[in-house]
């Protein structure tokens, strides 16, 4: 085995040690990662566990009695479950996780008011009494022409006072800053993945993920009716935001 091969077959752990890379011969795909998806994202995005905790905390401000909470692109289903478990102050609230990739189904454990479905969020019909919609790093994998219609569908089915809480990886406005962010993020990934894992994922996502910038994203959200759009989490180019649906007579006139 060459030195180059050795570098590809070992992975660095947070304590500075190395371990064999059991995934070294597997190409990156979300299906291949279905059994360890949450762990993979925790290692991929610095502060991801904090982001999810923040989303759960935010949910307590928006979830109401007799409404529905929708998590778009729920993967293993852990976020919607945590919201279900942490909002016991409301009654008759339904929690629904939606995922296109059916390989995640084995992780789903349903309750009377917690359900999971396999469906395409761009074409499915949404419940009309949504108090909260969440989506973590999902929109970047949706064709650009379908994003605004999806935002409109979310907005139209939210109750007044409801919220869309989401996170995305965004492009920087300037090329110099974009390069800085990418190199810093690459250095971070090298602490958790082999060079081969990083390269395989970049090649795969190159054709799947289509990033936008923050200005355009906010413009699109405002265009479909959202107000008071606020960033609550940020790390490198990864951003968490909350967009509110409020009555027009309560709009901030500033």
What function would you assign to each model-found segment?
Residues 1-36:
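N-terminal, positively charged/glycine-rich alpha-helical extensions of SAM-dependent methyltransferases
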Residues 47-65:
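Conserved alpha-helix/loop element of class I SAM-dependent methyltransferases that forms part
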Residues 70, 75-123:
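Class I SAM-dependent methyltransferase SAM/SAH-binding core
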Residues 134:
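A conserved beta-strand element that flanks and buttresses the S-adenosyl-L-methionine
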Residues 148-160:
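A short glycine-rich, Lys/Arg-flanked "PGG" loop and its adjoining helix->strand segment in the class I
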Residues 161-169:
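Conserved beta-strand signature within the Rossmann-like core of class I S-adenosyl-L-methionine
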Residues 169-220:
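C-terminal alpha-helical "lid/dimerization" subdomain adjacent to the S-adenosyl-L-methionine
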Residues 224-254:
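Core SAM-dependent methyltransferase catalytic element
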């Amino acid at each position: 085995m060459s030195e180059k091969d050795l570098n590809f077959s070992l992975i660095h752990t947070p304590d500075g040690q190395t371990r064999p890379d059991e995934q070294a011969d597997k190409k990156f795909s979300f299906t291949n990662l279905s059994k360890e998806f949450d762990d993979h994202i925790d290692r991929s995005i610095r502060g991801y566990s904090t982001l999810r905790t923040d989303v759960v905390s935010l949910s307590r401000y928006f979830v109401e009695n007799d409404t529905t909470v929708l998590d778009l692109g729920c993967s293993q289903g852990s976020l919607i479950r945590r919201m279900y478990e942490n909002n016991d102050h409301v009654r008759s609230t339904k929690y629904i996780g939606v995922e296109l990739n059916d390989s995640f189904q084995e992780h789903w454990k349903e309750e009377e008011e917690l359900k999971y479905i396999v469906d395409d969020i761009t074409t499915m019909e949404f419940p009309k009494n949504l108090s909260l919609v969440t989506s973590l790093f999902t929109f970047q994998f949706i064709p650009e022409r379908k994003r605004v219609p999806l935002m409109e569908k979310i907005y139209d089915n939210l109750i007044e006072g409801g919220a869309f809480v989401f996170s995305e990886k965004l492009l920087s406005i300037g090329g110099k800053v974009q390069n800085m962010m990418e190199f810093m993020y690459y250095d971070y990934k090298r602490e958790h993945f082999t060079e081969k894992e990083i390269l395989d994922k970049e090649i795969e996502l190159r054709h799947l993920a289509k990033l936008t910038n923050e200005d355009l994203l906010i413009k699109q959200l405002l265009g479909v009716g959202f107000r008071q759009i606020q960033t609550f989490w940020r790390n490198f180019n990864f951003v968490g935001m909350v967009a509110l649906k409020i009555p027009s007579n309560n709009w901030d006139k500033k």
